Amino acid sequence: QIPWFHR
């Protein structure tokens, strides 16, 4: 998953 896309 994307860490800098986690709200």
UniProtKB/Swiss-Prot annotation:
Q: Does the keyword Secreted apply?
A: yes
Q: Which GO terms describe its cellular component?
A: extracellular region
Keyword Secreted carried by entry: yes
A GO BP entry: neuropeptide signaling pathway
Q: Where, per UniProt, does this protein localize?
A: Secreted
- Where is it made, tissue-wise? Expressed by the skin dorsal glands.
Q: Where are the transmembrane segments?
A: none
Residues carrying Pyrrolidone carboxylic acid = 1
Residues annotated as carrying Arginine amide in the record are 7
Keywords attached to this entry: Amidation, Amphibian defense peptide, Neuropeptide, Pyrrolidone carboxylic acid, Secreted
Family affiliation: Belongs to the frog skin active peptide (FSAP) family. Tryptophillin subfamily.
What this chain does, per the entry, is described as: May act as a neuromodulator or neurotransmitter.
Tell me what this protein is called: Tryptophyllin-5.1
Q: Which species?
A: Litoria rubella
